[in-house]
């Protein structure tokens, strides 16, 4: 199974918080874990924000960042190409998504087209984004883009 993770799920791999165990299980069950290249900057920003807000100590931030840096090359990363960003723009309008969420959804769609919707799962903490991914999966299946 190929698992696509957005940044909210990716962060849960490096910071223990509610839902981390679920994401760890999904990742351990996946043959491939994919994400957008934009998740790198988003994850680093999220870790820094958690430190600023006091949710992470300095040493926990250092450990999380080091582990993330070591594991980043293991992810299948999708580039935010012009065509992918244009598709993301369409998805943002269709599903009322924020910009980076729509990039994650467009990246997931690309992964699902390559691996097949039957063999691809989407993971996010964001309910709206999860619902959009479910609707998009049904559309891809219905139109034969699986």
Predicted stretch roles:
Residues 5, 35, 79, 99-102, ...:
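Short beta-strand scaffold positions
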Residues 40, 72-95, 102-107:
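Acidic catalytic patch
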Residues 1-39, 50-63, 138, 144:
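Short, well-structured N-terminal submotif of metal-dependent ribonuclease cores
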Residues 2, 106, 110-146:
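Acidic, PIN/NYN-like endoribonuclease modules and their adjacent C-terminal/linker elements
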């Amino acid at each position: 199974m190929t698992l696509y993770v957005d940044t909210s799920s990716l962060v849960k791999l490096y910071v223990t918080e509610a839902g981390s165990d679920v994401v760890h299980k999904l990742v351990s069950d996946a043959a491939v874990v994919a994400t957008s290249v934009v998740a790198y900057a988003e994850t680093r920003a999220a870790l820094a924000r958690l430190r600023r807000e006091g949710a992470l100590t300095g040493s926990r931030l250092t450990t999380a960042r080091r582990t993330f840096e070591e594991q980043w090359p293991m992810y299948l990363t999708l580039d935010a190409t012009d065509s992918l960003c244009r598709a993301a723009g369409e998805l943002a309008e269709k599903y009322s998504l924020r910009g980076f969420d729509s990039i994650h959804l467009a990246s997931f769609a690309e992964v699902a087209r390559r691996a097949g919707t039957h063999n691809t799962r989407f993971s996010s903490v964001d309910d709206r984004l999860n619902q959009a991914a479910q609707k998009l999966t049904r559309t891809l299946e219905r139109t034969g883009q699986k």
